[in-house]
Amino acid sequence: MPITLRIFRFDPEKDKEPHYQTYPLEAEPTDRLLDCLNRIRWEQDPTLSFRMSCGHGICGSDGMRINGICGLACQKLVKDFLEGEEILLEPLPVFKVIKDLIVDLGLFLEKYNSIKPYLIAKTVPPEEERRQRPEEQRLFEAAIRCILCACCTASCPVNQSRETANYVGPAALVRAFRYLFDSRDEATAERISLLDHKDGAWGCQTLWKCTKVCPKQIPVTKEIGQIKRRIHEMKRK
């Protein structure tokens, strides 16, 4: 099956401006776009740069914009496109481009770390483990699936605006939700203080872009809404 990949290229060490380069190739319908990128790098152009690791939608490394929609190259199959179609591959928006399809996730991870993405338990640990009932775990089960691919943050219009560039972003809020609703966590008030401001949970404008692109089908917008409700509940106490 003939396809053509039109790929964003930019090497800051030698390019003044970004440009696009096309690569025609034959591919099987069941090939992933990541397979096609690897073949281009192996057979046509070894200078092409992109991130990858597991290749199975677990690591989140190969996030990029595919025909204008953010997603994982390892989850998109050739048969998802029309025969002979030119497929446009670009780096995730919002982030600074390091080279070609590779972006700098430093600020993304900095914002993620700002919400304290770990269990905070202040009581003395039990002899065995901090137990939890299955129904308690189900409250945040979906949030655990987040692989930090940054597709949600890159798709968020709030993150894309310079006026709201300090917004912590949907990925960080999903992780905040995960611990805010964890029955074992003992830092609810502390977490609320980190989220109760215009660049925290209230920065979300409920546009659902993040939910639509999440490769792990996490109900991102819904979970952010639950954070807002929890903030209101805490203030009423």
Question: Can you annotate each of these PLM segments?
Answer:
Residues 26, 66-68:
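Short strand-turn-strand beta-turns centered on an Asx-Gly dipeptide
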